[in-house]
Amino acid sequence: MTTFLAKNWSSLIKPTKVQYEAVDNNPNIKTMVVEPLERGLGLTLGNSLRRVLLSSLRGAAITSIKIPGVEHELSPVSGVKEDLTDIILNIRDVIVKMDSVQKCNLRLEVTGPAVVTAGMITVTDKQDVTILNPQHVICNLSKGFNLEMDLICEQGKGYVPTSCLHNSDSPIGAIHLDALFNPVRRVSYKVENSMVGQMTNYDKLIITVETNGVVNPDAALGLAARILLDQLQVFINFQEVEEEKPEKLELQTINPVLLKKVYELELSVRSQNCLKNENIVYVGDLVARTETQMLKTANFGRKSLNELKKVLANFNLEFGMKDIGWPPDNLESLAKKHEDQY
C-alpha cells in the first residue's frame, strides 16, 4: 500500500472532541456532540450508529412465566385485578441486569392484599442479577389470595418474538413473552454545520441516546462504534504500512525549557550582561550552576540572584539541578529544533 492510497483516509479531518451532556438531569439520557466531521460523514455515521444502537446491543429480558393453574394468556388469575395480558405487559417492562450468566430462574411469591412490584422478584439461582426498577408495578393482589410465579430471564440482543424463543427446555405450562433485550430505548440524531478556522463546510453530529439503565448512553454509543468497526474490518483488503515519524531529537527526554535562550527570560540589563560575560547561553546552562557559583560572578549580587530565582520558579526550575541531562551531546541540533517548534 502506497502513501498515496493512505491519503484517502489520513487526509480527512478527524473529530477532535466528543461532548457528553445529560438531558433533564437524567443519567439514562445523554446528548453527544461530535465535531468536526467531513461533509456528509455526519449523516453517514449518525444513521449507522442509530441502526446499530437499536438492533445489535445485548441485554437481558424475562422470556417466560409460569403461574400454577394458568395455562394460556387468556386464563384468569385468581385474586388479581388485572388481566393476564396486562400482567405480561408489565412483566416485559421489568428491567433486569445480568452480566455473568446467560440464563437464570426468578421467583415471585406474594400474599395479598398487596401491590406486586418488580422488587418482590427473587433470584432462585443465587446469580448476580439486579432488578433496576424495583418500584415498577406488576399487578394488584386482593386480600386472602396468594400469587406464585416462576420466571425465566435470558440474555440476548435486539427484539425476539415468542415464536423464536420457544424451545424444548421450556417448562410445561410456561407462557412465553416477546423479549426486548436491547437496553437502548430511543436514538435520535441531527447534523449541523461545524466551523474549522474560517470554514463552516464541516459537519457536527448531535446524537441523543436513551437507555433503560443497564448501560449508560455514552457506553452504548461506544459499543455501537466498536460493533461497526469490527464488522467493517473484513472490507480492508490491503496491508497498512506505518508512516515513519521523524525522530524528535531527544526532545521527549529533555525539558524543552532548558533549551530556551536566557535572553528570552526578559531579565534586567544588569543580569543579562552578567550571564553573557559568563557565557551562559541557555536556561540549562543557568540551572546547572549553584547559587554559590553565581554569586562569585563579577557584578552579580544578591538582587540579581533573587530575580533569577523568581524567573526560574515560574518554570519549576531552580539553581543546582542535577540529573537533567545537561548539556546534551547534540545541543546545537536540539536548540535548532526547539526554535523551529516555538
Swiss-Prot record:
The keyword Secreted does not apply. It holds the Pfam family RNA_pol_A_bac. It comes from the Bacteria. Residues 1-239 are annotated as: Alpha N-terminal domain (alpha-NTD). GO terms for molecular function: DNA binding; DNA-directed RNA polymerase activity; protein dimerization activity. Residues 254-342 are annotated as: Alpha C-terminal domain (alpha-CTD). DNA-dependent RNA polymerase catalyzes the transcription of DNA into RNA using the four ribonucleoside triphosphates as substrates. Belongs to the RNA polymerase alpha chain family. This is DNA-directed RNA polymerase subunit alpha. It comes from Orientia tsutsugamushi (strain Boryong) (Rickettsia tsutsugamushi).
